[in-house]
From Swiss-Prot:
Subunit comment: Protochlorophyllide reductase is composed of three subunits; ChlL, ChlN and ChlB. Forms a heterotetramer of two ChlB and two ChlN subunits.
CC cofactor note: Binds 1 [4Fe-4S] cluster per heterodimer. The cluster is bound at the heterodimer interface by residues from both subunits.
InterPro entries xref list: ChlB/BchB/BchZ (IPR050152), LI-POR_suB-like_C (IPR013580), Nase/OxRdtase_comp1 (IPR000510), P-CP_red_C (IPR042298), Protochl_reductB (IPR005969), Protochlorophyllide_Rdtase (IPR016209)
GO MF annotations, alphabetized: 4 iron, 4 sulfur cluster binding; ATP binding; metal ion binding; oxidoreductase activity, acting on iron-sulfur proteins as donors; oxidoreductase activity, acting on the CH-CH group of donors, iron-sulfur protein as acceptor
Pfam family, one: PCP_red
Key words, A-Z: 4Fe-4S, ATP-binding, Chlorophyll biosynthesis, Chloroplast, Iron, Iron-sulfur, Metal-binding, Nucleotide-binding, Oxidoreductase, Photosynthesis, Plastid
EC numbers: 1.3.7.7
Pathway the protein acts in: Porphyrin-containing compound metabolism; chlorophyll biosynthesis (light-independent)
Reactions catalysed, as given in the entry: chlorophyllide a + oxidized 2[4Fe-4S]-[ferredoxin] + 2 ADP + 2 phosphate = protochlorophyllide a + reduced 2[4Fe-4S]-[ferredoxin] + 2 ATP + 2 H2O
Cofactor(s), by name: [4Fe-4S] cluster
Protein name: Light-independent protochlorophyllide reductase subunit B
Annotated residues for binding of substrate: 433-434
Length: 509
């Protein structure tokens, strides 16, 4: 738990609620004070769904603090059981209500005696983990609960007759998750691999018993789904892939690993093994436009330009590799806020970036951007805000994001169509060649600057002494003109004819 002005990853209970609201016919109950129950509004706004968000707040107020929470929580659990008739109810405290140190498992046990629905308490330490880690843990807990339950009733362990896959980690409020899921389904259809389950988004908890029937598991995002894949491998020996099919090179690598995972099962079933090399070649040469674009004169204009990349571990690592090895763009600094996955992230990007930044502090990211002065930024909504402050364009490549990055149109980042979308995003995030040249010559079309120059305050002509002229180049280029204008404006107001370093600092104050 952390007190902060702004956080990249939210509190733990948000992760648990995302899991619950991704499944069909699952209800979540928050044991929370007023103020912690913003998830309903946030999800309704961002996901633009027709249905109400199936999450209820069991409010902790002064009466509850005086009498204890048991009656209110149990009553809310039973009420939702009758009203909604869900397959599963997940109870979660928030980091605030966790301070009360109540025995919520006892409340769940009491309600389970009467309830027709399954009820579980989210097994998450709200003081130690964030939204991402809590979502990963909660998904694994739900899968473990239902598979353990089915084991007692004899679980069907027979594999599907044809190659099949589980896609694990598609979530509500995920960054382009719905679009990526469609693209992954299209990819597996092209490879003649059947989709066994997609969890948790749109999945049913009653169908979790069929997870072990798949030939392999794919975890497209490292942040959420790996714990479930580990559990399925340990309990059922299911192989899993955690490579993200983002970018031309990693798409090919992912498909080759799928081939290696499928062929051993094919030999067991007495079927012919698969070879996807011709498919990779065809997609790379004719379907993905990113390959020829990276060789075009447009992309060559980016040579020598600097970028800063920041986001979750999956997207930041993938975009860094795409920029550096597929488009020849220099990545001056890349980073992630996923501190728990820092070792993997460093291993992935160490050969593609001059500097690596692991932090949850957006102020440090802002300082790094100000220091580097990149031509473009690729990050979250916070990096977009930072970019606006410094007048640097930002392409959004990772959560957290606002509503404009929940597009209604089809915008995958994964698969071969995703390579086209990423190429467009990168291209549109830079000032174009001739545009950049004209801006250097004419200084753009800043009308405020024209007005300031044509309407000087007072009639004084100010001059800069030698020291102050030497100081000006030390100021970052993107704010240098503004500093110069504001200093001259300050000098004219004060009646100062000669600008010294002292006048510059006084103007700054």
């Amino acid at each position: 738990m952390k007190l902060a002005y702004w956080m990249y990853a939210g509190p733990a209970h948000i992760g648990t609620l995302r899991v619950a609201n991704s499944f069909k016919n699952v209800h979540a109950i928050m044991h929370a004070p007023l103020g912690d129950d913003y998830f309903n509004v946030m999800r309704s706004m961002l996901e633009r769904e027709r249905n109400f968000t199936p999450a209820t707040a069991s409010i902790v107020d002064r009466r509850v603090l005086g009498r204890g929470s048991q009656k209110k929580v149990v009553d809310n659990l039973l009420r939702k059981d009758k009203e909604e008739n869900p397959d599963l109810i997940i109870l979660t405290p928030t980091c605030t209500s966790s301070i009360l140190q109540e025995d919520l498992q006892n409340f769940v046990d009491r309600a389970s005696v009467i309830s027709d629905s399954n009820i579980i308490l989210a097994d998450v330490d709200h003081y130690q983990v964030n939204e991402i880690q809590a979502a990963d843990r909660t998904l694994e807990q739900v899968v473990r609960f239902y598979l353990s339950k089915q084991k007692k009733e004899k679980l069907d362990r027979f594999l599907t007759d044809v190659p099949s896959v589980n896609i694990i980690g598609i979530f509500t409020l995920g960054f382009h998750h719905q679009h990526d899921c469609r693209e992954l389904k299209r990819l597996f259809q092209d490879l003649n691999i059947q989709i066994n389950q997609v969890i948790p988004e749109g999945g049913s908890v009653e169908d979790l018993q069929n997870l072990p029937k798949a030939w392999l598991n794919l975890v497209p995002y490292r942040e959420i789904g790996l714990m479930t894949a580990f559990f399925l491998k340990k309990e059922f020996g299911m192989p899993y892939l955690s490579i993200t099919p983002m970018g031309v090179i990693d798409n090919a690598e992912c498909i080759r690993r799928i081939e290696k995972s499928v062929n051993p099962f094919a030999s067991i079933f007495g079927e012919k093994g698969v070879n996807y090399e011709s498919y990779i070649d065809r997609q790379t040469r004719f379907i993905s436009q990113a390959v020829w674009f990276s060789r075009s004169i447009d992309c060559q204009n980016f040579t020598g330009k600097q970028t800063v990349v920041f986001g979750d571990a999956t997207h930041a690592a993938s975009i860094t590799k795409i920029l550096a090895r597929e488009m020849g763009i220099r990545v001056s600094c890349t980073g992630t806020y996923c501190k728990h996955d820092a070792e993997w992230f460093k291993e992935q990007v160490q050969d593609f970036s001059n500097e690596i930044l692991i932090t949850e502090d957006h102020a440090k990211v802002g300082k790094k951007i100000a220091c580097v002065e990149p031509s473009a930024i690729f990050g979250t909504q916070m990096e977009r805000h930072i970019g606006k402050r410094f007048d640097i364009s930002c392409g959004v490549i990772s959560a957290p994001v606002h509503i404009q990055n929940f597009p209604l149109g089809y915008r995958p980042f994964m698969g071969y169509e995703g390579t086209n979308q990423i190429a467009d995003l990168v291209y549109n995030s830079f000032a174009l060649g001739m545009e950049d040249h004209l801006l250097d010559i004419f200084g753009g079309h800043d009308m405020k600057e024209v007005i300031t120059k044509s309407n000087p305050i007072g009639g004084l002509d100010v001059i800069w002494d030698t020291e102050s002229q030497l100081e000006l180049p030390q100021i970052p280029r993107f704010v240098r003109d503004k500093v110069k204008r504001e200093t001259e404006k300050f000098a004219k107001i004060k009646g100062v004819v000669k600008i010294t370093i002292e006048v510059m600092y006084a103007a700054k104050e």
